Amino acid sequence: MIRDMAISTITLGGLLTGCMASSILVAAEFERQTVLAVLCKPVSRVYFILGKYLGILAATCLLVFSQGLVLEVALIIRNYGTFQNGVTNLSSMIDFVCILGICFSLLQILILTAISLVLSLYLNTIANLTICLFFFIFCNTFSYILPLHSLRHEGVNILTAVCYAVFPNFQTLNMVVINDVVAATSSPWQTSNIAQYIVYGSVHSAIYCTAVVWLAVFLFKRKEIA
């Protein structure tokens, strides 16, 4: 329970940092017209967007990793205190679920920061953060709001399938699902299932994040800056 709450807090902090940084920094470039000075130099718009995005991610990842390291050390100390007979095997004390939770938190941050970057091209900070908040809530709950049932009308099934394709399912990246997958009965099939779960979550998040960043570059290339 403590581990799950700590990872959720780290995730929310990282999401807030990434979204606020992208919404404030990029929007401020347009408000102060400093983007014109940057683009007058031999810097393409692609590199401008990628530089902003990667810089924000570097700072956010450093924050999340440092907090995750503190949490993991605290869990190792707690596990060491619960073991008897002076167990010295470090691998038995490392909380791999915590590490996986931190990594999947970063995947959520990657996606939502990219969404915020796109919105920052046209919206101010308050509108940007508001949309990101509703986007995050919807992506964590739409598997309940839009359940896929075979008995539904075909048109409704198509609509819900489109929603599953357009919106990332953050619920598959949170600690509830991670605990369900890891805590299942140990077997060769379960080990393979965990590996598939990690690969699927990572690949899907990477593809979605790449598509959103490409959209940001596409829109920024066509944006008139006066």
PLM feature spans:
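Transmembrane helix boundary and interhelical loop/hinge segments in multi-pass membrane proteins
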Residues: 19-39, 43-45
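Alpha-helix N-cap/helix-start motif at helix boundaries, enriched for small hydrophobics
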Residues: 46-49, 220
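Secretory targeting signals
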Residues: 1-25, 49-125, 148-165, 194-196
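Membrane-helix interface/capping residues of multi-pass secondary transporters
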Residues: 34, 45, 125-126, 225
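Terminal transmembrane helical anchor/hairpin motif
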Residues: 1, 88, 122, 127-218
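Membrane-interface capping segments at transmembrane-helix boundaries
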Residues: 217-226
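Alpha-helical transmembrane segments and their helix-entry boundary regions
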Residues: 37, 48, 128-132
